[in-house]
């Protein structure tokens, strides 16, 4: 972290020399990835063509492991305050909770932000029931992958790290066979 601009400039400089260059990042380059920054830096390299190739982001990868939590409207929110002030993150959490979105949290904890998931859960519980179905997936598609389904009040005291993606259900989300499922609203089911 913190050397992303340098990586982008280096990629463009190498491309300027006639090389074919790839910028690799985890997940999907267009979801908390490098695609936006590549376009921003690319303004200074108008002769270089960019192609963004989609990947599998933690939200969709983790959702598949948990069951089907993202079947209805949802939002992604990063708890990292490195590039976004906490006040803005807090406002987004409250708005998402009030609107009854399923919320997928990225970057739920770090050494400096060990209590941010607790803060996020407290904010969510202003509009969501403590019994809201939630889930976590750690090390998605890696060795040591783990998934857990729990309530929002249990999530509040769950230990997570930067390799964990957190899913907070909406008022319709339920647990089915230890999987997290958000109904789409089909009748007669």
Regions found by a protein language model. Give the residues of each.
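Predominant activation on well-ordered alpha-helical scaffold segments within soluble catalytic domains
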Residues: 9-12, 35-39, 60-64, 118-121, ...
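Short beta->alpha junction loops
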Residues: 1-3, 79-81, 139
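A contiguous loop/helix-start segment that scaffolds small-molecule binding in enzyme catalytic cores
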Residues: 20-21, 98-189
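Class I S-adenosyl-L-methionine
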Residues: 1-50, 61, 156
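Class I SAM-dependent methyltransferase SAM-binding "motif I" and its flanking Rossmann-like core
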Residues: 31-99
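A generic local secondary-structure boundary/capping motif
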Residues: 12, 64-66, 90-94, 123-125, ...
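Conserved active-site and cofactor/substrate-binding residues in soluble primary-metabolism enzymes
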Residues: 2-6, 29, 33, 57, ...
């Amino acid at each position: 972290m913190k050397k992303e601009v340098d990586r982008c400039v280096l990629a463009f400089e190498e491309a300027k020399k006639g090389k074919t260059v790839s910028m690799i990042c985890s997940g999907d380059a267009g979801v908390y990835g490098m695609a936006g920054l590549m376009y921003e830096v690319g303004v200074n390299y108008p002769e270089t063509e960019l192609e963004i190739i989609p990947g599998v982001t933690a939200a969709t990868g983790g959702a598949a492991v948990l069951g089907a939590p993202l079947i209805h409207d949802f939002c992604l929110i990063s708890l990292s305050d490195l590039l976004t002030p906490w006040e803005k993150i807090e406002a987004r959490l409250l708005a998402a909770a009030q609107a009854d979105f399923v919320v997928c949290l990225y970057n739920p904890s770090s050494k400096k932000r060990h209590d941010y998931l607790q803060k996020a859960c407290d904010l969510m519980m202003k509009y969501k029931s403590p019994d809201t179905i939630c889930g976590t997936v750690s090390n998605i598609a890696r060795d040591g992958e783990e998934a857990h389904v729990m309530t929002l009040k249990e999530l509040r005291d769950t230990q997570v790290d930067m390799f964990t993606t957190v899913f907070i259900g909406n008022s319709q989300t339920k647990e089915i066979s230890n999987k997290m499922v958000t109904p789409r609203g089909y009748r007669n089911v």
